[in-house]
Structure formats: C-alpha cells, structure tokens
Amino acid sequence: MSKVYDWFEERLEIQAIADDITSKYVPPHVNIFYCLGGITLTCFLVQVATGFAMTFYYRPTVTEAFASVQYIMTEANFGWLIRSVHRWSASMMVLMMILHVFRVYLTGGFKKPRELTWVTGVVLAVLTASFGVTGYSLPWDQIGYWAVKIVTGVPDAIPVIGSPLVELLRGSASVGQSTLTRFYSLHTFVLPLLTAVFMLMHFPMIRKQGISGPL
C-alpha cells in the first residue's frame, strides 16, 4: 500500500496539498457564526444529491408534474424522505445564507482586500433566492402556478421592455408549458452550474485572503 501511495505522492505531491489544507491559521476570534458559509455549502450539496435523485421520477410537463410529485411522495422508495430533505435543506440554505451575509457585513468582511469575495458572495445569494423561486413552481400545483404568474408578471411594470421581459420569462404570452420548461431548466441546470462556478471563485479567494479580523 505504501508503494502505491509513494507512486501518487511522487507525481501529485499529495502531502504538500494536505499540509496546505490543514495548516491554515485560524484566528482566535472565530466562533460558530463563521461556520454559516460552510453550512450553506453543505445544504447546497444536499440539494444537489436529493434533487438529482428526484429527476428520475419528476416529469416537467403541466399535465404530469403534479402527479409525478405525488408518485415521489407516495410510491417511490424513500421518495417522501428525499423530497422532504430537499425541501428542508432548501429552507435551511436560504436561512443560513441570510445569516452568513449579515455576519460578513456586521464584521466588515466586505472591506479591502475582500471586495471581490463579497461580490461573488452577493451573486451566490441572488442565485440562492433564484433557486427558491424556480423550485417553488415545479410541483405545478395551485400555489406554484400562481406564484409563477405573479413573479413573472412583476417586470411588466417596467416601461418599454416590461412586456418583452415577461414573455421571455414565460416563454409565451401566458403561463404554461413553456414557463415550466424554462423554470425546470433553470432550476436543474443553469442555476446549479452558475452556483458551482461562483463557488469555485468564492472559496479560493477566502483561502488566499484568510478570515477577516475582529472589528
């Protein structure tokens, strides 16, 4: 076994990477509130795992979406548990994200030289809220339908470009299959991809700059 490890160590310098990960200095003022970002990440990973599991059963059509969610909850093995964990972790992710933003703001973590870390964090906060908006519609029940109708109708108040924006969001003049398809694509592909990209920008900057000092 040691020969296998030595072979990889010679080529990848695993020990140096491990030392870099485990030897970062942690300031004495750090407390549990500095873990909120990590908890948010954990919730996101739970979302990815449970959401991926539900894609095997969910059908993104206006005629079958609600029935497929019912099937997940009543007939699919552990489907009720997977969807419940998905829903609970979604709520937890939003809550932890809000608390994390407040913690960073109140402790001055957005100040020089961490401006870019703050900007990427704000983008991640917007993406998190977008997950909630798009995911809420996917069961295509009465609550989801009317929530989508209200949310997508908000831009209509914008002069000149309002109506085109509404049609872009809905995929047509009214809420229907095109709207559900758009929201499903956003929720399961576009938003997770963008979130992963901005996380890959956010975390290395934290590693590079370290944790901000006390006020």
From Swiss-Prot:
GO molecular function, one term: metal ion binding
Cofactor: heme b; heme c
Localisation per UniProt entry: Plastid, Chloroplast thylakoid membrane
BP GO annotations: photosynthesis; respiratory electron transport chain
Miscellaneous information on this protein: Heme 1 (or BH or b566) is high-potential and absorbs at about 566 nm, and heme 2 (or BL or b562) is low-potential and absorbs at about 562 nm.
HAMAP family for this protein: Cytb6_f_cytb6
Listed name of the protein: Cytochrome b6
Species, as recorded: Solanum lycopersicum
